[in-house]
Every structure is written in C-alpha cells, then in structure tokens.
Amino acid sequence: MKLVYNIKDKPKFGQLIVFAFQQLLAIMAATLVVPVITNGNVLAAIESGAVTWEFTAQMSPAAALLGAGLGTLVYILFTKAKSPVFLGSSFAFLGSMAAAFAGAVSAQAGYAGLIIGAAFAGLVYVVIAAIVKFAGVNWIDKLMPKQVIGPTVAIIGLSLAGNAVGDLQKAPAGGHTLIAVLCGLVALLVTMLCSVFGKKTAKLIPFIIGILSGYAVSAVFTVIGNAAGIDALKVIDFSPITALWADGVTINTFFQFPEFTFVNALKGIKEIDGAYIGSLAMAYVPVAFVVFAEHIADHKNISSIIEKDLLKEPGLHRTLLGDGVGSMVGAVFGGCPNTTYGESVACVAITGNASVATIITAAVLAILIAFVSPFVAFVNSIPSCVMGGICMALYGFIAVSGLKMVQKVNLEDNRNLFVVSVILIAGIGGLALNFGKIQITSIATALILGILVNIILSKKKKA
C-alpha cells in the first residue's frame, strides 16, 4: 500500500508527538485492562476460598503501560528499527498469570511467579529464534503459505468483533444502550471521514480526532443527564478523574509512582520452591508456542502493509528475540508479558504512517505517561462505547488485511478452498482446546488445523 511515512522517515517533532499519541491511544485501553482483569481473577479466587492470602498490593495498570513502553523499545532495538509495531500486554497469558497467583503461597510469591513465568515464555522465543537463525525462514513460508496465513490474519480481527460490538453497546449502570451506541458511532464516523476525506494532517490522526469527538458527544449527554437527573443520558464515569483530588490536591494528584512487579517479587522470592517453578513452566511454556503462531501472523500482516518481508529482514530470529526479551522486560515492571499488537498494525495501515520513529516516541510517551496521574485518569474515563466504535475500524482493518492476502490465493483449487474454509470457521466459531489449565486459543487452533489440512491435501496422488 502507499505509505505517507516509510519506516526510516522522521516526521517533524510536533507531528511526531501527535502521531505517537495516536499509536498510544490505539493500544492503551487493552494494555491497561489486562492487569485489571488479572486483579479481578485473583480477588475471585480469594472469595471462592481457592486462595487464602490477602491481595493488598494489586497489579498496577500504569506499571503495565510502562512495561509495554520499555518492551517496545527492546523490540525496536533487536529488530534494528525496521519493524513499526508496538508491544502491549498479552491477553493470551491471562490464564497463566492467574495460575501464577493461584499456585503461590503469598501475593509477593505470586509476583515473583509472574516474572519467572514470563522468563519461561521468553526462553521459548529465544530457542525458536536460535533454530530460525540456523535453519532460515523458508520452512515458515512452506508451512504457512498465503492460504494459511491470510485467513489466520483475518480471524485475528474477526475474533475480536464481539469485543468491539460489546464495548460499543456498553453503558454505565442506569445508562441507555442506544445513547452509548450513538456516541460510539460518532467516534467511528468521524474517524472514517478524517481518514477518507481529511487533509494530510487529519488523514494521519483520524483516531485522535475520532476519540475526542466521541468523548465530547458523550460529555454533552453526561452533563445534560447530571443536570436533569436522567441516568439514561449518563455515558461517562468521571470517577477516575474526580478521585485525583478526593483527598485534597497533593503531589499524587499530578504524579504517581507505579507499584512495579519486581518490587513485590523481591519480597516473595524466598517463598519460591521447585514445585511452584514447575507449575509456572506448565502454565507459560505451552502458551508461548501459541503466541509464536500469532507472532508470525502479525508480522506477515505488517510485512504486507509496508511491502517488505520482515521475516527475512531484519529476520524472524530478530523479531522473536525482540518480542521475547521485550515480553520479559514488560513482566519485570508490569507483570504482564508483552506481544505485538494488532491494533498498532491496523493504526499503521489506516494512517499510512510506518515511521519507526513514531513507534519509538510512543514507547517513550508510554513510559513517561505512566507517572502522570491526570492522563491515566483521562484514559480510564474514556467510555467503552467510544473505544468500541474505534475498534470496529481497527479490528475490521486487521480482518480485511487478511482477506487481501486471500485474494492472491487460487480458490478454484479445492485444496486451497478447504484450507481457507477450515481456518475461517474454526477461528470465527471459537474452537479453543483446553488441557487442564492450558488453553490453545481459537486463533492458534485454527492455524494448526489449517497447516495440517494444507499438508495433508498437498500430498501428491499416487499414479
């Protein structure tokens, strides 16, 4: 596709900050919600009696954001600044993180388990990277041709459709779903108009304009609802913002110091034993292989967008090392292993901005913003419906990117037709495989099925 900014291009400083801010908004909501979900899982385990210790020091979303920024910088370093994608908290490891806390003798030991588990996952990436370094990547192309990768990329976006629509329809307690949908659709419409009809600057920052427009409309409804006492019109929950000065205006109103994972982990490292380490390996290593499959799909997707094969230059071994080590760094600070974000890839595609300088700046901003209380509070106050509208475009574009790859496949050949069909139905249908606490996600299951079907049907018929 035609890019406005290529990988090595460096926009002017003012533009760079705005573009980076847009990348940050695209990945921030998902990155912040992973530690929140994990906190909820741990508290649920405590309520059920499965966990008996207190969970006073919960995981910090701000620390996860900082970890994502640091992880992205590590990734950029390993990939020689040739791959324009941001790393964020991985949803694939949610079960693994819950298992790390569930098997620990204390919350502090659980935090140590998060780091050890991420190290196991990162080690899987390092081992695969070493194999790729010596064996090359041609086997990847043979194992995962376009008829396999194309529909897999498509289902990465399509499998998130329910999340986007669910968020679009989400209203606060007492709020009306139709009002929420209206606000989300305003954000989506403005984003599309800016991207298609906007002048150069508007074309490059459609998501910022769309989110702010949706937020403004939501704020108008909320103000009217508060003034008239009509709960149905209340869309925005301003409590994250008002909480900043609930105890008076202090330094914490403006700046905060996130509670890093390694700080709590150091207190619990003495409580770690061999059995617990073994359980961590069982919880994290299989998931790492699943995420490896998604890693390839993401990089095939971004390669098609920038029209450069990232698996060959800088090389799959470098992208794996960057992802693996970046994931470990993210876990040390935020507790969450990182992964390449499809939202970031979609943002690059829609805006035509593949500048790695933008990604680096976004990573630096993520690190700095993690300490700025008002900004984190503002992001937390953005209504789910607004982000749902934006995600309809982001996730949709991921799906379309995969379908564009399928366009190049000869679907008149029944072999290709069956491969694509199996992947799409298994992925969209949500075919996940569970082995105890280990889950192979629907995307990974669909990819594995596609590979197997392609191999079986590729066998030459005997004369």
Residue ranges of model-derived segments:
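C-terminal ends of transmembrane helices
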Residues: 4, 71-83, 126-140, 189-200, ...
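Membrane-embedded helical hairpins/re-entrant loop segments and their flanking transmembrane helices
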Residues: 13, 39-74, 283-356
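Hydrophobic, membrane-embedded alpha-helices of multi-pass small-molecule transporters
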Residues: 14-31, 176-187, 205, 250-298, ...
